Amino acid sequence: MTRFILQRSDRQQGWWVCTDLEHNIVCRFQEHNYNDTQQFTLLDGDKFDSEHEALRYATYLREMADWLRDNHYDKVF
C-alpha cells in the first residue's frame, strides 16, 4: 500500500496536500514554499493521547518531509 499521496489542493490555487494514509496526517503547503507554509492536521478528528504519542508523530512528519524532498523536490522548494 502507498503510504503518501500528493495532490493539488482543490481549495487554494498553488497549494498542495500531502496525506500520510498510514498515520492519518495531512500536510498542506504552498508550492515552492514548504518550509514557511506547512500546515499539519490529523484526519478524523484524531488527537494525541499522550506526550509520547505526540513525539512519535514528530517522526512521522519528518518521514513525510523526507519523502516530499526525495520524490517531489520541484514542488516543495
Please describe what each predicted stretch is.
Residues 2, 14, 32, 55-58, ...:
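Intrinsically disordered, low-complexity segments enriched in small/polar residues
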Residues 5-10, 38-41, 70:
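Short helix-onset patch at the extreme N-terminus, typifying the N->h transition
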Residues 1-24:
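Short, charged/polar N-terminal "headpieces" of proteins
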Residues 8, 27, 32-33, 70-77:
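Unusually extended, aromatic-enriched hydrophobic runs near protein termini
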